[in-house]
Amino acid sequence: MLTIISSAKTLNFELIAFKGELTSPAFPKITNQLLAIVKNYSEVQLSKTMDISEKLAHLNKERFQNFEKQDSKAAIFAYAGDVFNNIQSKNLSEDAVNFLQSHLLIISGLYGALKPLDAIKPYRLEMAAKLNEINDLSKFWQDEITNYINHTLEHHKHKYLLNLASQEYSSVLNQDKLKYPIINIHFKENRNGKLATIGINAKKARGNMVNFIANNLIDSPDLLKEFSYLGYKYSSKDSLNNDLVFVK
């Protein structure tokens, strides 16, 4: 079973006490192609393209211009935000991190698909960004990432793709070309008799599910039904086929 999650806007490049070796991202040529585009953007263009403030545009202009000189960090430790904070990567054992290395992919607008220990540099390029040269990054990446997932799952015992990514990032999947079943996870809350997704709580739960998978070395969708967090529990009556629903 292979899990996908979205990358995050927020980064944390402070040093950590991780002594393992970093690995290399799978698509360096495509990353360099994208870098060549955004390096030529002015701060005004970056602000408009990425829908960010002038301050953030200035920061990312500097990041792109000095990209090769920037320090690198393992992706699982470099991203922050609600999902990654709840993965609690700093507290994972070496065995748990090594398990995720072959069972987790982080979907990124700049890097495509990252293994947890792949070395990344500080950047911001969301999948929703509309570059002048590439209007839809998810379509741009679609075949590369789908083929990469197919190739990865060929070597797994349980050939399922667990989707814990947002709609923005899971749209990179070409479901017509994906060879293996997708398991979609939904976190719902009972609000006035109706089930609704509360964004921030769902993000936290997705991160904690990755933590649960890592700590318990889970490689089968059936074992996910034991997951509970923030009051979310598996609901068989609300789940259907490959859509697993957790309700609180």
Curated annotation (Swiss-Prot):
This is UPF0246 protein A1I_02510. PANTHER family: PEROXIDE STRESS RESISTANCE PROTEIN YAAA, PEROXIDE STRESS RESPONSE PROTEIN YAAA. Pfam families: H2O2_YaaD. It comes from Rickettsia bellii (strain OSU 85-389). It comes from the Bacteria. One of its GO terms (cellular component) is cytosol. InterPro entries: YaaA. One of its GO terms (biological process) is response to hydroperoxide. Belongs to the UPF0246 family.
